[in-house]
């Protein structure tokens, strides 16, 4: 991911990355409520301590990070939301993983497809056509549910973990254009 952060810097952005509790080298155990809190603390730090206006902040979430990004972005006056390979809900993800029997157990967890309806900011959804971890239909479901200004970028042949490197030109050009267009409207 460091390469991705460096690329975002080359596009002229400041980057504040979060490692959620229980992920990577972060301590603690992951939970839906916990990672949402981590996202909120990070956003509040960037806005209140670092002094960035929320209307100039883009929130970026990839895969499971899309759930934190979507939860955080709802009802906020931010510059934009970028979701890469977003899952639509834990229920849908359990079904994709062959855990259909578990769908009643996940309840309303990670419901991007519901929360995205409260997004006011511009939205960019990017997804690979060959994503076998979070199928593209989930990204489309999130996109279709959004009512804000939105665009969907499908990357032909891309899987779940190779969008930013193997398909770099399409990926980074799309992000660059979105950042410029959304910033212009602020």
Protein language model features and the residues they cover:
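Short alpha-helix in the alpha/beta-hydrolase fold that links the catalytic acid
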Residues: 4, 112, 121, 135-144
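Mobile cap/lid helix-loop segments that gate and shape the active-site cleft of serine hydrolases
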Residues: 79, 83-121
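Acidic catalytic loop of the alpha/beta-hydrolase fold
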Residues: 129-134, 160-162
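C-terminal catalytic histidine-bearing segment of alpha/beta-hydrolase fold enzymes
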Residues: 140-144, 148-186
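Alpha/beta-hydrolase active-site loop signature
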Residues: 20-24, 88, 159-160
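Membrane-embedded segments
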Residues: 1-45, 73
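Short beta-strand/loop motif that positions the catalytic acidic residue
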Residues: 118-120, 125-127, 131
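Primarily recognizes the serine-hydrolase "nucleophile elbow" in alpha/beta-hydrolase
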Residues: 45-49, 54-97
